[in-house]
Amino acid sequence: MSSGQNSGGLMSSAGLVRYFDSEDSNALQIDPRSVVAVGAFFGLVVLLAQFFA
């Protein structure tokens, strides 16, 4: 990539940050700990299924 070209990566990243940073009051609010707990639960279910299969 030549030093004269600007790929616009920084500008597009700034747009994504602005898009994902906006909070919608009507959006479903999920606690991050709940997501981790559900993922750990399903992981445990898969491990137990492999152990008993």
Swiss-Prot record:
One of its GO terms (cellular component) is plasma membrane. It is found in: Cell membrane. One of its GO terms (biological process) is protein transport. Residues 52-53 are extracellular. Residues 1-31 are cytoplasmic. InterPro entries: Preprot_translocase_SecG, SecG/Sec61-beta/Sbh. Disulfide bonds: none annotated. The chain crosses the membrane at residues 32-51. It is a single-pass membrane protein. Pfam families: Sec61_beta. Coiled coil: none annotated. Its main location: membrane. Keywords: Cell membrane, Membrane, Protein transport, Translocation, Transmembrane, Transmembrane helix, Transport. It comes from the Archaea. Component of the protein translocase complex. Heterotrimer consisting of alpha (SecY), beta (SecG) and gamma (SecE) subunits. Can form oligomers of the heterotrimer. Belongs to the SEC61-beta family. Involved in protein export. The function of the beta subunit is unknown, but it may be involved in stabilization of the trimeric complex. NCBIfam families: PRK01253.1. This is Preprotein translocase subunit SecG.
